[in-house]
C-alpha cells in the first residue's frame, strides 16, 4: 500500500559451510579394438624359437591350412582339390604353397590357424593326409574325409 522499504527492513546474512562439493563425470569407454587387443595379447605364446597365437578354434581367422608338401608330382593339384572340397563343406580354409612345409606351419601358427593339412605322395596313393594341431603340434595320418570332419567339429 505505498510503504517504502529501506535498509532497516532488510537483513542480509552470508552463511558458509565446511563441505566441499566436487562434480563427478564418469565416462566408461571401451571399444572392439581394446577387446581384440586383449584377446590377442593373452593368446600370444612363445616357446623356444616358436611363436604362435593360441586362439580358440571358433575365433581363429581360418579353420584349416591346406599345404602340398611340394608343388610338383601332382601334389599341388591334389591339395587344390582338397582345398575346394573343404570350402564346399563350409570350412574356412587357407591354401599355401610358398616356402618349406616348416615355414608354412610357422606362418599358420603365427596367424592362429588351428589345423594344418599336408598333402604328400602318400595322399596320392591311399587318400590320407597329415593333420597337425597347432598348440600341441600333434600330427596324425587320417583320410581326407576324417580330417575334414575333425576340422568341422
Predicted regions and their residues:
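NTP/phosphate- and nucleic-acid-binding module
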Residues: 1-153
